[in-house]
């Protein structure tokens, strides 16, 4: 199965294309969609949507996995995160792809073994698990962790533990 | 000037196409984009985006005006509202249209004369101001109020009072 993992944020969205199953996986592509502050919010969201569409056209993933939002400092942040999350959801729906959401805490628990792992620990573990020759940027590592959790969830017991839901 | 006004929400997005200037306006089209609960969130957002694109293609507005989010009960609501707001922003940016945001309170103050006006009062006043033969659905009336405020804001003094900002 081929999965597109997304860790969305208005100015810095991590993405990853992973192929494999619940026991093994390899990274085909990963990176960070960076939008400079001079671009207004509407243009930034459109750019994330277009980038996601391009990734889907190029890599033809079977499904999409995205990080759920659990904790936010303020309503302002929540609104901005909700908007950033909408852009890849729209791109996925345009291609008729199903999107699954995972709690960031459960993804970290599954991948690093600790729900409170920090960004460096996730990047370090992802590098080891996928045999990458470099430590990935942390937003891309988060996207790979989500995609990896989604591949693990092809085992139904893991899907329950990971508390996944369709969005 | 022709303006597309949008009052976004995941399941019920009001829209309005108004033409005019700061002193007079008429409604060319208005309505509510309703998405049934059986459609997942990603499909709902995609549908709002596509509907907005269709409206832009049909009516060719010069600018887009959208309601800002001021008060929300919970982070969950804020995330959902942020997502709903992203869909028309993406559609507008795809056509290179500038989007202006207005505070709902200031729009009500400008149109009804009272920042705390309820939905019925807005719909009643919009019907009178635009000479409509029916009382519009409240979500459509909100979108017309935003579009009307935007036309008023073509007078720079009004733009300042309305506290508008580009998004």
Regions found by a protein language model. Give the residues of each.
Chain A
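Phosphate- and other anionic-substrate recognition elements at nucleic-acid/protein interfaces
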Residues: 1-167
């Amino acid at each position: 199965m081929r999965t597109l993992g997304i860790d969305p944020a208005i100015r810095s969205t991590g993405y990853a294309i992973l192929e494999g199953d619940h026991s093994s996986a390899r990274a085909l592509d990963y990176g960070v969609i960076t939008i400079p502050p001079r671009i207004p919010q509407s243009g930034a969201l459109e750019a994330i949507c277009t980038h996601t569409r391009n990734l889907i056209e190029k890599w033809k993933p079977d499904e999409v996995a995205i990080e759920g939002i659990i904790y936010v400092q303020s309503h302002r942040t929540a609104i901005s995160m909700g908007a950033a999350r909408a852009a890849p959801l729209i791109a996925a729906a345009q291609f008729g792809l199903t999107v699954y959401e995972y709690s960031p805490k459960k993804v970290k628990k599954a991948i690093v073994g600790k729900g409170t792992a920090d960004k460096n620990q996730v990047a370090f573990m992802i590098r080891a698990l996928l045999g990458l020759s470099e430590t990935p940027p942390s937003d891309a590592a988060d996207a790979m962790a989500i995609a990896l959790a989604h591949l693990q969830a092809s085992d139904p017991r893991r899907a329950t533990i990971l508390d996944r839901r369709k969005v």
